[in-house]
């Protein structure tokens, strides 16, 4: 989820190429880097502050305002727009929003919230976890084959 970074008038042939994806399939994605969102979705969230220069999560949460521009630039959730490609999100356990998770960094709570945000922006998002409803593709390979072959 990012605007195209290509430079169509560049002399550099590589720089002229689009950076946009046509689809994405990910496993256990941390779809937000915002510590406030992370704590709301999964109270025992504790990972991510190091990417912004914080040694622990409490300092990250307390210093959130100082890195809001970076969160807006790099957090997948904040980058979703109506022109984004379809995504396939795979998680190993069902979601439980607002509850502590065994693996808070890779919880399907991230997938639930990203899917909601994608739906608000008319972006196709398939969320897969054990016993998930509305799964259209048996696995990431099936999703990718369909999207990449135009079937």
What are these regions (language model features)?
Residues 1-41:
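Primarily recognizes the serine-hydrolase "nucleophile elbow" in alpha/beta-hydrolase
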Residues 2-7, 35-79, 85, 106:
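Mobile cap/lid helix-loop segments that gate and shape the active-site cleft of serine hydrolases
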Residues 12, 64, 68, 99-102:
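Conserved short-loop catalytic and cofactor-binding motifs
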Residues 13-18, 77-81, 150-151:
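Surface-exposed acidic, glycine-flexible loop patches that form ligand/cofactor-binding
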Residues 17-22, 81-87, 121-123:
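Short, proline-enriched alpha-helix->beta-strand connector loops that line the catalytic pocket
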Residues 28, 53-55, 131:
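Residues at the C-termini of beta-strands that transition into short coil/loop
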Residues 28-31, 84, 91:
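Generic secondary-structure microfeatures
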Residues 87-102, 108-151:
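C-terminal catalytic histidine-bearing segment of alpha/beta-hydrolase fold enzymes
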